[in-house]
Amino acid sequence: MALLAPGTPIREGLDRIVNGRTGGLIVLGDGPEINGVCSGGFPLDVRLTPQALRELSKMDGGLVVSSDHERIKAAAVHFVPDGSLPTLETGTRHRTADRLSQQTGVPVVVVSASMSVMSLFLNGRRYLIERPEQLLARANQALATLASYRGRLVDEAENLTTLEIRDQVQVRDVAAVAQRVEMWRRIDAEVRGYVSALGVEGRLVQLQRNELSLGVEDLGRLLTDDYRPNSVAPGGFSLSGLQKLSWEDLLNVTMVAETINLGPAEHPLDSPIRARGHRQLTLMTDLSSRTIQRIIDHFSDLQSLVSASTSELGDIKGVGLRRAREIRQGLESIFEGDQRTHHH
């Protein structure tokens, strides 16, 4: 879809065909498999420009574009795909395009003259190529959802921080954050799809998406680093399995806990669990991941880190006294913030 995004020569040419109301059929690739379904027409080798695409599509028949989408290789071609291939399309052009793409595996674009609609056929599926304003409306809707999911995720992560400092984390709390990470990831993937489909029109969406991913994108990795079991046993704690869950299952915390392998089988939802401290150290310092790993290897979990003295921290290679103070102050401010909210 990125190839047909606004701003690309192919898309500009297609827009001109739509505006000219002539219609067209364009095969986005050339090769032996395409030669086998062509009859008539004439071979060419001209640079693909919006003007050339528009002019050459005025003739009867279709166009063949090179596989790198840089050149037009044939025009006025009559295509004869295998007529026994199943298609639900009704218009002649659309039926031909559907069968062509099924038979060759090459994407085929159709502009319908009567409806001014562009469709992309690929592997037996038809995708509507929407106008930028239609895409933008949907992208903005997805951004609004992403913003609200981000808010919930940040809340869950802050709640987890409080519980980590108090040493009150249960399996269900980690599962709740993992659930939110995956919900955010799904909508983010949708937004990224719109960005690539929007091409040059997608810059603003991209900027907003970048802003909404700040501080959230690494959460999944930090959560994994914090709660992975020590054993190197296969099938340890991992968020990737959540991508396979249906939305319905994703809303079920027990399912989530089982899928990330913190599950009720070996740990009931209310069983206690301790963080190593990766997330907290990453949030409050600019230490390299190597140094953070050294600190964590030294203290084994966040609880021992919380009770460590500045000098004990400073002695670890790569930390030093200034950073050690930063870490102490960071931990204390979380602790004090928690005390304050606790007393209110």
UniProtKB/Swiss-Prot annotation:
Limits of the DAC domain: 1-133
Enzyme Commission designation: 2.7.7.85
Reactions mediated catalytically: 2 ATP = 3',3'-c-di-AMP + 2 diphosphate
Cofactor(s) recorded in Swiss-Prot or TrEMBL: Mg(2+)
GO biological process per UniProt: DNA repair
UniProt keyword list: ATP-binding, DNA damage, DNA repair, DNA-binding, Magnesium, Nucleotide-binding, Nucleotidyltransferase, Transferase
InterPro entries linked to this entry: DisA, DisA_sf, DNA_integrity_DisA_N_sf, DNA_integrity_scan_DisA_link, DNA_integrity_scan_DisA_N, DNA_integrity_scanning_protein, RuvA_2-like
Gene Ontology MF terms: adenylate cyclase activity; ATP binding; diadenylate cyclase activity; DNA binding
Binding site for ATP: G61, T92, R93, H94, R95, T96
Subunit comment: Homooctamer.
Family: Belongs to the DisA family.
Function noted in UniProt: Participates in a DNA-damage check-point. DisA forms globular foci that rapidly scan along the chromosomes searching for lesions.
Protein name as it appears in the record: DNA integrity scanning protein DisA
Lineage: Bacteria, Bacillati, Actinomycetota, Actinomycetes, Propionibacteriales
Gene name of this polypeptide: disA
